[in-house]
Amino acid sequence: MAITLINPEGLPEIDVYRQVAIASGSRTVFIAGQVSWDADGVTVGAGDLAAQVEQCYLNVATALAAAGATFADAAKLTAYVVDWTPDRMAQFMEGVTRAARKLGTTPAAPATLVGVQALDIPDHLVEIEAVAVLD
């Protein structure tokens, strides 16, 4: 495996991701921001943050698979969420949990969540991008 995830001593341990990803592979995969579209370009879960997060993670998994990667190869995840407030974390994590169940894995790469005013299409509440490293 080209990625080793750790929580170093001196930094808080976060349940849903690791603080550091050590990449030893030779190929880097950059996944464009994935929104909650299905394969036909139709928005999934309009107005429902959990449903959109779930679809975004499923789309990231599809993109990773096309490159021969999985979430185990992810070195960094970044989520952009419209009108973010901390009280929406439970909805966000519900979507992550549902996607993880469907995928049979829990994304644990270092992650950043950024609140934004808007995304490209008004129905989109979240966009998630990934960087993965392969041997």
Stretch-by-stretch model annotation:
Residues 1-58, 62-76, 82-135:
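N-terminal presequence-like segments and the immediate start of the first folded domain
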